[in-house]
Structures are given as structure tokens and as C-alpha cells.
Amino acid sequence: MPDIQILSPHLADLIAAGEVVERPASVVKELVENAFDAGARTVTVELRGGGATYLRVTDDGCGMTPEDAGIAFLRHATSKLHDAQGLEAIGTMGFRGEALAAISAVSHITLTTRRRGAPGGTHMTLDAGEIQDMYETGCPEGTTMIVRDLFFNTPARRKFLKSDRAEGAACAAAALRCALGRPDVSVRCIRDGEELFFSPGDNKLDSCVYSLLGRDLAMSLLPCAGEADGVRVHGFLSSPAAGRGSRAQQYFFCNGRWIRSAALQAALEQAYRNTLLV
């Protein structure tokens, strides 16, 4: 037998899942971004504990046909990219077709979806990426995804999850970042029956910030905007008096997507160098 072996599809899926799904917050990010790409105007994130046991994302987006639902959890299945030329014009949050396959490989999933204008919907259950049941059902337009027992078949991954408190906070933070990047979509986050935040979805960044980050912070912010070389920048900056000793509430977005950027952080801190201790 040769030393080099081709991985089984199941093992390849588990490895890929480890790259895409690091913790429950990764699932929140991927499912909320999928809802945005589906044209949702409202998204609700519900979790219990830290999100590993139970996590539900509901949207009123375009939904899926039974045919699309049947292949949505296969690796490299995507509705967002069809040829190489499309790579030059990607305008969606995701396009690789890996997230749903990765999530389903390490969890139990219940999907309920109905295409806009369709007379009925589809209910489907999956265990470790394998479809267990699929049938027609009545449901609202849009999609509801329930993810249970994340990492049930990869105990080493589950062992390294933090406390429910920490994982739940990370899930809420992921949903909040998504909401800040899309003030045109109403996002609600609920943990153990308690609403953590709600954004109005009125496409006004100031009211979005007010709802998500609180009145005191919102009232201390100063609007800023500029454009150069085809790049437009807009947002809010805090007054020096409202400065904080950490970067915890520095948020940068590119085309609606939250990003980490050491260069942008450095530029921001350089601008404040004479007024803040950073």
C-alpha cells in the first residue's frame, strides 16, 4: 500500500470544517452573511448558552427551492459564482460554497426554507452532512437554519471551546459586527430568551450605532466622510473625551464586511496621537 492516500470525503469534510468553523461565532457569521446575500430585510439570531448546543438563524430572504436545498450542503455548491470571470465582480459576502458544508459536517442541522412566491416550502434534516429527511412543508418565505450539537463528532474541537458565557459573548459580537456593516437590514440577537440587541434596519448608520452601541457612545460620535481615487470613506469618530484604552470598539468595514486592518488602526491612532493615550 502506498504511503500517500487520498482522504475519504468524510475526513476531508471534517478537516475543511476545522478551517471554516472555529467556534459557534463562526457559524453565526456565516449564516447571517448568507442571509444578507439572500436579500433578507430582517435576520434573527437565537442561541442557547454558548451557541454550541443550539443556534438558530431566521431570515426573510429569497429562500431556496427543494432542488437548491438538496445540494446546498455539498462542498463548493454556491449560487454566487458561475465562472472565472465572476471572480472579478464578486459583490456577495460569500462565494466559495464551503460554509454550509463545513457547518453541517460537524453538527445536526434542521433547515426550513421557502422560495419567494412558492406555494410551499422544504423541511430538511442533516446529521454530519448527510441528509436524513426531506419533505414539503408550510412555512414563511425565507430560511430558518437550526444548528445543534456543534462539534459533536470532533470532541477535541469541542474540548477547546471556552465557557458558555465567553462563547455566547463571541456569538453576540459576531452578529453585532454583521449588523453594523448592514444598517439597511434589521438584525436581532436573542440569548437564552433575552434580547441582547436589535437594529432598526432603516439604512441610517447613526440610528444603527445608537441601537447597537448605546445612546452615550452614539451621542459622542462625530460623522466623517471623504473620497479620493475612487474610494469613498464614511463613518463616525469618537471625540477625544470619549476615548478608550483599548481597540475593542474600533470597527472597520469594507463594502459592508467587517475587517481587521492593522494599517487602518495605525492610521487612526496616528491621527489621534496628540489627544489620546493609545
Predicted segment positions?
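N-terminal phosphate-binding caps/lids of nucleotide- and nucleic-acid-binding domains
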Residues: 1-278
